[in-house]
Amino acid sequence: MSQFSVLNVGFGNIVLVSKIVSIIHSDSASAKRIRNEAKSNNSLIDATQGKKTRSIIVTDSNHLILSNLRVESLTKRIESRDNSIASEEEDLD
């Protein structure tokens, strides 16, 4: 049985690490532009549970996944293979 490396992008949502092309900050002008394009193309996936979008994950299928986790946090999770849920980043209030 093969084992897939996954990334918890918040609130129990996961993405296969092998499918990630890049992770970008959500507040840049170019990020907002590609976000709007993805929304109009029906290729936008919102994994924020209504929280502020802090990063955008671009996949090899040209889907964009919105995450409430910071780029740095997602990068650390990939590097350390840690997919635990940090309560300070996922405040459910």
Curated annotation (Swiss-Prot):
Top-level taxonomic group: Bacteria
Coiled coil (UniProt feature): none
Short name of one Pfam family: RemA-like
Membrane-crossing residue ranges in chain numbering: none
Family: Belongs to the RemA family.
Protein name: Putative regulatory protein LA_2599
The species this protein was found in: Leptospira interrogans serogroup Icterohaemorrhagiae serovar Lai (strain 56601)
Lineage, opening ranks: Bacteria, Pseudomonadati, Spirochaetota, Spirochaetia, Leptospirales
